Amino acid sequence: MKFSLARTTQAAENLLRAVGPGFSPDANDAQSGGALDPEVCFFRTNRLFRRFRPSLAAATVAFLLLLPSAAQTTTYTPPTPEPVAPAAQQKPPGGKVIFSRSTDENGQTTTQTSPQAGPAAAPPAVQMANAPTAEDAERQAVTFTDFDLDVRLRTAEQHIAVRALLTVRNDGNTPLAHIPLQISSSLNWERIRVNVKDVAFPVATLNSDADHTGQLHEAAVLLAQPLAPGASLQLDVTYSGSIAPSAQRLLAIGTPEDVALHSDWDRIGVDFTGLRGFGNVVWYPVSSVPVILGDGARLFDEIGEHKLRLAGARFRLRLTVEFPHGHAPSVALINGHLAPLTVTDAGGLDEEVAGVATAGDGGETLGFEAPSLFVAIRTPRTGANTMIWVLPDDEAAVQDWTAAAATVTPFLQGWLGQRPRSQLTLLDLPDAQDAPYETGSMLATAIRPAGAEQLEGILAHALTHAWMESPRAWLSEGVAHFMGTLWIEKQRGREQALGTLEAARSALALAEPESPGQGVGQPLADAISPVYYRTKATYVLWMLRDVAGDPTLSAALRAYDPAADVSLGYSRDTGPSSFEKLLEQAGTRRDLSWFFADWVNADKGLPDLSIASVFPSPATAGEWLVTVNVANNGYASAEVPVTVRSGSNSVTQRVQVPARGKAAQRLLILGKPFEVQVNDGTIPETQASVHVTRLDQAAGDSPAATQP
């Protein structure tokens, strides 16, 4: 099937919006238990003094990418493990090694089991499937609640090897006879164990654009006993392979190669490793429904669903990086957080001798995010609440970025508090055209010279994450977008800020259900689509600003505690959210339950407002009393600004208009009124967000109202 350039370019832009930074318009322009025991960890023989060997990884990836894309499934044969005698002169650093990994003379990965671990038993051969074993219902039933990863990178060979302890839960309604696990098609499953026993797992290749290769390798883990609904299971899995730049999914729909590669830049390399996770490159095990680009918004919804299902999961990662002599990485970021590196480089020896760097994250609870991993050779530079990891060629641009951060910081402090919860980390991407990526308080982007206005717009959004790193997408992204629009208001005026909101309203109106009977939509608390947790959330915060007032909203944002919010859980049945309580406590203790019920905890669509009628009448001393009747044909209630204007004055009051109902507001104004306006653009509607009625000027005329 042929696609036009316009359509493929649009698909690429949609992908960027779904998995990219979600900046303001300016930016778009420029378990506690169950951890891996030390006695069952990886150990790589001769890891410090092993010479690098040529790798066949690139050929493997090329072969996989040439597989017919029309086929639903294909099969592969993973590398055959060969026993390797351990080096006699080297002892493992502590503990009992029961599993080791090394590279043979041909650059192939080999594994072995230590004699101390008991009788060696080879894992069962991988079964090659002609069709997938799992069904979509089974894939959707699997929820990951714990990741414990031991990740080994050989950057010169673009190679990754992973051993992971995974805890999964059956969130379906029926028992699961097998567990579907998926990784990128450039990676190969090697071994899967359940209850310390090797299990068989047929492997199929699925067409899915959740990975940059356009395919996933799915292992269907056979269980001795079905996993009951609500029950959990731990799996011990091993896999490896190479991750090179690939834009196969975009090339398949006709996207120009240079555009595609600047969007899908994930790779493992000596100078830069960037693995953005599900939606870009599936470097950790997942269970997802296969989806492709061009099928409406299904891919982007699946990306959001993946992030939502991971929220609350525990995540630990230990990282080992083997690098060529003299090319030690200087920065590692796990899920956007800096992970201090310990580097051992054998100075003075042969240049082909590998060095080793190690890092770990200590464990965290995931929010609405896809786990990511970055390792790079960069130089650190500091700014206001900012750490910039920059390439040598981009040093000249650092001053522009630090100056912009210094300009924006006082504005953010006024709204969010004097001290951020963390620093913003900026990571310089290899190419100036590479698409930016944001996770938490980390922004990967090209550090290039740009105008102050553009950089300030970028950093007003990005720095907000250093203050407000919420596990709730609508707060994390919504507050960042909100602060971006407030910065526009501060610099360019309110009309410009409202114009920014209006530019995104039509997409939101298209996504929203016209009535609750057409579907449940996406409540903000569980939103998976950017148009909800970015656009609608920004509108919600603008409305709360008007309903509660700037001081109250600012106080609630300052008092917000992500850890306390997480303790409430991710279920909608946990009662009022912590943010709702903070708002009610920070102000005059006004009841906001009606607002959160219609705009956050449920998706009732958008209001559909109109001016039903206007009745002006003269009062005393040149004053007029104007009665404005406002109708709402939508299913979401709203508190609406109503403005009456005369020749020399204007008066604005707010009126709460119920869903599918009407409300009347009386306003007293000096001078004869000539215009009535309902809504000022801060409340998103299905058709328009500003309604104006001009009153008849001729004396004695009836108070007719006309919409412009």
Where are these regions (language model features)?
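N-terminal, polar/Ser/Thr-rich
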Residues: 72-161, 593-597
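A surface-exposed beta-strand-loop module
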Residues: 98, 107, 187-264, 303-309, ...
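Solvent-exposed beta-hairpin/edge-strand motifs
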Residues: 176-205, 322-324, 647-652
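Beta-strand-rich binding/interaction modules
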Residues: 191-193, 328-331, 616-679
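Extended, low-hydrophobicity, Ser/Thr/Pro/Gly-biased non-transmembrane segments
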Residues: 236-371
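Juxtacatalytic substrate-recognition/specificity segment
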Residues: 378-475, 479, 483, 487, ...
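Amphipathic alpha-helical substructures
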Residues: 420-421, 530-621
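Acidic/His/Gly-enriched intrinsically disordered linker/tail segments
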Residues: 474-550, 562-571
